[in-house]
């Protein structure tokens, strides 16, 4: 079934098209949901809600001529997942209480004592576990900017906060992720038999 047939079939409520859409995208989006969520339970709730919302918005793809269908589905899913996480008020709260000042040079290095870890060349289970350990605001910002390649302006708009707050949160997320990965690597190396 071609992409056009898939989209058309989904509009017509065709069960075969719906099943193919589900089979094609569900596992990809499930992993994205895991990255944005703190655990499997929250991920499942976000996945089910966001997946159904993406499915209901497929008709909006027609006007999106510069984006591939896969990217459209992924970006819409991320948008709904982020909004779901933001909707958990007892967990997600970001407030900018200090006016950020932009410096042209850094006078410190968060990673002075350790090698910076490339997130694309690390064990994905270890990375997922470490990302899920971040506080929600850091988890969202890190996923948006580093893994999903959103621009600073896009992340700022989606999270409804200033670009300076996003930069600050990203720096904290990188630091905390680095430390979490280092700790998880130490734990896993101690657990392996010699």
Please annotate each region the language model reported:
Residues 16, 27, 38, 67, ...:
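Residue-level signal for the short linker/turn that defines the boundary of a DNA-recognition helix
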Residues 60-62, 75-97:
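Arg/Lys-rich amphipathic alpha helix in sigma70-family domain 2
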Residues 11-12, 48-66:
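Sigma70-family region 2
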Residues 5-10, 126-134:
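Short amphipathic alpha-helical boundary/capping segments
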Residues 8-31, 35:
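A short, charge-rich alpha-helical start-of-domain segment used by transcription regulators
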Residues 127-130, 136-138, 144-147, 152-187:
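DNA-recognition helix of helix-turn-helix
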Residues 21, 25, 29, 50, ...:
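Residue-level preference for hydrophobic side chains embedded in well-ordered alpha helices
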Residues 92-120:
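Internal acidic/polar
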């Amino acid at each position: 079934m071609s992409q056009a047939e898939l989209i058309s079939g989904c509009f017509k409520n065709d069960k075969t098209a719906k099943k193919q859409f589900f089979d094609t995208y569900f596992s990809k989006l499930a992993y994205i949901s895991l990255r944005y969520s703190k655990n499997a339970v929250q991920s499942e709730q976000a996945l089910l809600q966001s997946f159904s919302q993406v499915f209901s918005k497929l008709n909006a793809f027609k006007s999106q001529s510069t984006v591939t269908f896969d990217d459209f589905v992924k970006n819409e899913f991320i948008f709904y997942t982020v909004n779901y996480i933001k909707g958990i008020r007892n967990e997600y709260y970001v407030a900018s209480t200090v006016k950020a000042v932009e410096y042209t040079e850094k006078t410190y290095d968060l990673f002075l004592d350790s090698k910076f870890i490339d997130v694309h060349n690390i064990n994905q289970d270890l990375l997922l576990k470490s990302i899920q350990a971040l506080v929600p605001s850091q988890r969202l910002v890190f996923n948006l900017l580093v893994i999903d390649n959103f621009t600073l302006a896009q992340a700022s708009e989606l999270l409804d906060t200033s670009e300076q707050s996003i930069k600050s949160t990203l720096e904290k997320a990188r630091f905390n992720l680095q430390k979490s990965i280092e700790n998880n690597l130490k734990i896993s190396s101690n657990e392996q038999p010699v």
